[in-house]
Regions:
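Short acidic DE-rich linear segments
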Residues: 111-117
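Short, amphipathic alpha-helical interaction segments positioned at domain boundaries
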Residues: 63-88
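A short, conserved structural fragment
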Residues: 46-56
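Generic structural signal for hydrophobic core residues of well-folded globular domains
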Residues: 15-16, 49, 69-72
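Short, hydrophobic-biased segments on the C-terminal half of alpha helices
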Residues: 39-43
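Leucine-rich, amphipathic alpha-helical/linker segments
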Residues: 81-110
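Short, basic interhelical loop/turn and adjoining N-cap
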Residues: 33-34
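Short amphipathic alpha-helical interface segments
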Residues: 1-30
């Protein structure tokens, strides 16, 4: 299954918005395609350090996950980030974060007059 960066962002947003401390993505024998995608992407989020598995199919967002989400939360920043990643032919989640932070720094300079270098 190919990694879907929009879906990664969606799972992080869902996890943060939930009143529950955990995101469920339980693996079972008769999983639908959507359930497989959810489980696989939750595992990818664990690989990246953005989620921690607290039980089989039960995940919590980590501080690293919150930081990534803070960088990609804005739809404007996210769309610019995806466009830039596409121009590069695809990038790692770390580069996605760096691109998003770069756009946030540009906005800070324009809107606040602060150069965050």
């Amino acid at each position: 299954m190919k990694r879907d960066d929009d879906y990664i962002r969606q799972l992080l947003l869902e996890s943060e918005a939930s009143s529950e401390p955990y995101l469920m993505a339980v693996q079972h024998l008769s999983m639908t395609t959507e359930e497989q995608k959810r489980h696989q992407h939750a595992e990818l989020l664990c690989d990246a350090g953005f989620f921690e598995a607290v039980n089989k199919g039960v995940y919590r967002i980590t501080n690293q996950g919150h930081d990534y989400l803070a960088a990609v939360r804005s739809d404007t920043v996210w769309n610019k980030t995806k466009e830039s990643a596409g121009q590069l032919g695809g990038v790692t989640l770390g580069i996605m974060r760096d691109l998003a932070v770069g756009y946030i720094k540009q906005e800070a300079k324009i809107k606040l007059g602060i150069d965050l270098g």
